[in-house]
A protein has these predicted regions:
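Intracellular juxtamembrane helix-capping segments at the cytosolic ends
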Residues: 127-141, 174, 392-407
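A late C-terminal transmembrane helix in Major Facilitator Superfamily
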Residues: 408-439
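Hydrophobic core of transmembrane alpha-helices in multi-pass small-molecule transporters
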Residues: 29, 110-128, 374-394
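Intracellular loop-helix junctions on the cytosolic face of multi-pass helical membrane proteins
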Residues: 2-17, 105-114, 127-128, 132, ...
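C-terminal ends and interior cores of transmembrane alpha-helices
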Residues: 92-108, 356-374
Length: 470
């Protein structure tokens, strides 16, 4: 199962511009569907009667494949030239997994079915994300990236498009200075991801809540939602089968994979651990988003928990409006604003303010925990403010990742390690989040999350100090 790569020189892509890019929004939309499904799964488990501690533990365990990303990168590396096959295969597996979960929700073994089939979906989503990041396209002539590196690029070949962490990064090659300058253009890809999250966390959550009211059957309602999500994945698979470049034309090719072959991983890792700047960056990835690690699972559970349990008691429809719609739009706006400020003023000026902004999500939830009877408008405003601040901080994290991987022979491995270290605290803290809720209430958790912004401020200052000469 490999895409055959012809040895002859590639001819320019002759298809129309619109036809060439029909796969562009759908790739990013498919990447956002995975996050939406995890949110839907968490709410579904609570609506089906699973307690808070078990729900948090289940979602954290389902997120474990994210920590195996460097290993998955190695697996994909040994299937050279199969980027399109990975994309299509993982989307088909995702569709089958969601359909299996939807089928088991009607039975008494719904929990066993969810636990058995959801790991297939999560693993396939990680592989899909890896394949997406390796999918290179020349925007002008449709030639291989290796051809551009082996010869002096023409003005038409000057712009390459790379997918990196859900953001389109344009690499402008300069033949006169022989260096690459990276500029971020996140508006389009951020918009596609936002649409996917709005569809999954907003529209589908709203449908589930309305179906619960109409049918008075929770199992049927959520089974229908998962069948629809499986249909979306199947449609994307069919769409990419038709419009995704590759196959006999060979427009897709994996990017350089230094450090992902046998023996190279240890060498690259040792080299990384000997550089003080790299150690500082690795520490930054682990600790900067530490305040958000406590909120990633506890905040949604707080929104849907009953008032007598210390929550707000939002219905699925209200959750879809606040967390699935307004909060998603807010985090996208904050992310876009952060990218613009970095482009205008640079990272050093805004890294410390963004660390302080990480206290806003916890403070907003702390305010709501003391005002559980607040109207829906106040809840929506507080969540929007917190997510806008989080989006602004995430844009800073993204820029640090870009600097960590830029102009490195093992940039693919570095990108995988960076994403793994960012996700590790979320998974580990999420495993104990449910147990923490049985010992302390939401107010204390949100207070601790707000205070943890001190760690973010400290590691941001350390990063600025270590990179001051650059």
């Amino acid at each position: 199962m490999t895409d055959k790569q012809p040895k002859t020189t590639y001819r320019p892509h002759r298809r129309g511009t619109k036809t060439r890019w029909l796969w562009l929004p759908s790739l990013m939309f498919g990447d956002g569907v995975a996050v939406s499904v995890l949110v839907l799964t968490m709410v579904m488990l609570r609506r089906m009667g699973l307690d808070t501690a078990d729900t948090a533990l289940a979602i954290a365990l389902l997120s474990l494949p994210v920590l195996l990303r460097p290993l998955f990168e190695m697996v994909v590396t040994h299937f050279w030239g199969t980027t399109k096959v990975w994309i299509l295969s993982t989307q088909f597996i995702s569709a089958l997994s969601l359909a299996a979960v939807a089928f088991t929700l009607h039975t008494s073994s719904w929990l066993l079915g969810t636990v058995c089939f959801m790991p297939f979906f999560v693993c396939s989503s990680v592989f899909y994300n890896i394949a997406l990041h390796r999918f290179y396209i020349d925007t002008s002539q449709g030639v291989h990236l290796s051809q551009v590196h082996q010869q002096n690029p023409t003005p038409q070949q000057d712009t390459m498009v790379r997918w990196c962490d859900g953001e389109m990064v344009t690499l402008h090659s300069s033949t006169s200075h022989h260096h690459n300058t990276t500029t971020l253009h996140s508006q389009k890809s951020c918009g596609f991801l936002t649409m996917a999250l709005l569809f999954g966390c907003g529209v589908m959550m709203m449908i589930a809540g309305n179906m619960e009211v109409v049918t008075r059957n929770i199992r049927y309602s959520w089974s229908l939602v998962f069948y629809i999500m499986a249909g979306v994945e199947l449609f994307l698979w069919l769409w990419h089968t038709i419009f995704l470049p590759g196959g006999t034309h060979g427009y897709a090719k994996p990017k350089p994979t230094m450090g992902l072959h046998r023996g190279e991983f240890r060498i690259s890792l040792r080299r990384m651990l000997k550089r003080k700047d790299d150690i500082t960056a690795l520490t930054f990835f682990i600790l900067f988003l530490l305040p958000e690690t406590l909120l990633a699972l506890t905040a949604p559970l707080f929104l849907i928990a009953k008032p007598h349990n210390g929550g707000l008691g939002l219905s699925p429809q209200e959750f879809a409006f606040t967390q699935g719609t307004l909060a998603v739009i807010a985090i996208a706006l904050g992310y876009t604003l952060g990218g613009k400020t970095i482009k205008r003023h640079g990272l050093r000026r805004w890294l410390l303010p963004s660390a302080l902004l990480l206290a806003v999500p916890g403070a907003a939830l702390l305010f709501l925990s003391y005002n559980t009877a607040a109207p829906l408008s106040i809840v929506a405003a507080a969540l929007a403010a917190g997510h806008a601040a989080l989006g602004f901080a995430l844009s800073m994290v993204k820029q640090v990742v870009v600097r960590f991987t830029r102009n490195m022979p093992d940039n693919t491995l570095r990108h995988a390690i960076a994403r793994t270290l960012i996700a590790t605290p979320f998974v580990l803290v999420g495993m104990f989040a449910g147990a923490m809720l049985t010992l302390i209430d939401y107010q204390h958790i949100f207070l601790v999350a707000t205070e943890l912004s001190i760690a973010s401020l400290t590691v941001a200052a350390l990063y600025l100090y270590r990179t001051r000469k650059k």
